[in-house]
Curated annotation (Swiss-Prot):
The RNAP catalytic core consists of 2 alpha, 1 beta, 1 beta' and 1 omega subunit. When a sigma factor is associated with the core the holoenzyme is formed, which can initiate transcription. Signal peptide: none annotated. Its EC number is 2.7.7.6. The keyword Magnesium does not apply. It catalyses: RNA(n) + a ribonucleoside 5'-triphosphate = RNA(n+1) + diphosphate. Disulfide bonds: none annotated. Promotes RNA polymerase assembly. Latches the N- and C-terminal regions of the beta' subunit thereby facilitating its interaction with the beta and alpha subunits. The gene is rpoZ. This is DNA-directed RNA polymerase subunit omega. It comes from Geobacillus sp. (strain WCH70).
Amino acid sequence: MLYPSIDLLMQKVDSKYKLVTVAAKRARQLQENEELTIKNPVSKKFVGQALEEIAADHIELVEEK
């Protein structure tokens, strides 16, 4: 079973494409030594940690126009 589940993540983000984009951008920030906002992440990979942050509502999604 994957954590966090896609169902939980889709409740936080209205589009799976936006979810992928946000997770990738956040993973890139984490790779560049940005501080992690959750304690004791389940995943050891940056993308997994980014998804955990999204699931925990630690990432605020802002629409750019």
